[in-house]
């Protein structure tokens, strides 16, 4: 399982849910780099996963929330172009697109559910 050298224009785009499109870039079993677009108003509800998640916003603005479970939000804010973030392994987080947004995310370990797509 490895895609060492890739080009965004040559990769398959997958709509994960309405308004959210993912493109896998380079990855192996330990790490994964993905390109995402989100349509203004689309949301990812509070969730968590094993992978540490680092992101960098290329255009648009995201509203994020961090929580200590499904409901208790302890931090929220906005991230715009040039902004970056990191969510720890199993940290609950949510995202809403305040504009049409384009961003890159890095996961460690690679998200196996994304590789199958």
Model-derived segments and spans:
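Residue-level recognition of short, solvent-exposed, well-ordered loop/turn junctions
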Residues: 39, 58, 80-81
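Ligand-binding loop in jelly-roll beta-barrel domains
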Residues: 78, 89-113
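Short beta-strand His + acidic residue motifs that chelate non-heme Fe in jelly-roll/DSBH
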Residues: 44-46, 64-65, 87, 92-98
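Short, surface-exposed secondary-structure edge patches
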Residues: 35, 54, 75-77
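Glycine- and acidic-residue-biased ligand/ion/polar-headgroup-sensing regions
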Residues: 51-69
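Conserved short histidine dyad/triad with adjacent acidic residue
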Residues: 32-49
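A short, N-terminal "cap"/entry segment at the start of jelly-roll beta-barrel domains
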Residues: 1-30, 77, 116
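Short acidic-glycine-tyrosine-enriched beta hairpin
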Residues: 69-89
